[in-house]
Amino acid sequence: MYLERLQLANFKNYEELDVDFSNNVNCLVGNNGVGKTNLLDALYYLSFCKSYFNPVDSQNIRLGADFFAIHGHYRLDDKQSAVQQLNNQQPTTNEVTVSCTLQRGQSKKLKYNKKNCTTFAEHIGRIPLVIVTPSDQNLIVGGSEVRRKFIDGIISQVDKSYLRQLLDYQKALEQRNKLLKQFYENRYFEEDSISVWDEQLVRYGEPIVAARKAFLDEFRPLFVKYYQLIHPDAQTTEPPTIGYETQFGEGTPTMAEQLKANYRRDAQLQYTTIGPHKEDLQFGIGEFAAKRFGSQGQQKTFLLALKLAQFEYIYAHLGSKPILLLDDVFDKLDMQRVSQLVLLVGSDRFGQVFITDTQQGRVESIFEQAPEMPHKIFRTENGELRTEN
């Protein structure tokens, strides 16, 4: 799959834009603050119905305007076209259009092939996309919620039933926590009432844990492969690892048993202390935790390997190569790793790629090493794009 044409109106700093892209590598170059990242965010909107950077949709409307509109014209590969036809998601054509619009004071609207989407969740996975940004460093150094969101987001793109289980689990968790707070405030505890929500948590939570374990079994080898491709010496000097921190390992009590055993503690704390919402991933480099002891370069390599493994996992399960967005990823990497990364993502194993950089000369020097690689370079200035090659 690739994006042929993008049209923007009043999106962030873009008043109006109509641009065609290469189906291979697209580089957006320019100073900081001129709109490179904003354009990538528009692509993210078309895949996930939301911004990657700003959760308040209305704040993405250009200053002084009353609406924004994002229109994408995509071309599917033959395999994905056949799959979507089988699922009645599109007409018998390789062309797909996606539109996301927002009028101030109204609800956001999403259209797929000119038909309104009844829920945003039904759209997830139709336009697979992987994004890497400087803020993703929180995946390494941030709290456990960021890492859970990472794996949940990947699985949800390829498994709609998993997404429904997550949503149902979250609803049950909110109700159980609300009940625990009432117990605390009213100084009483009623086991029959809370057991109703225990049953819901177990019903949705156990499949979530099982799916995460199965995902990691498949994901780890992909991650190690890409880490070593970016950093060939890692196999002997700093082998990377991903550990799974769960309350439900082999030989532990069941989720139902643990929920019941923690009634008193949960009532005192007013929230549920047991469940998949408490799980975490442990990232290691050699014998040390990447979060505490990894250098900035090592952490950046770790992050890139996670994201490229995400790309291959989604491709393997959906049969279509996700669009890959690399936003300002060259910082903290030496020129050798930068070259290895660009040559890697520009190879046949990947599909359409968007790269932002402040240094045009840097990306041009890399393409000189691979003149046969199809690519476009765009100069970005104040909400406008100009082709440089």
Task: Pin down the residues of each PLM region.
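Nucleotide-state sensing region of NTPase/ATPase domains
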Residues: F48-I140, S144-V146, I155-V158, Y162, ...
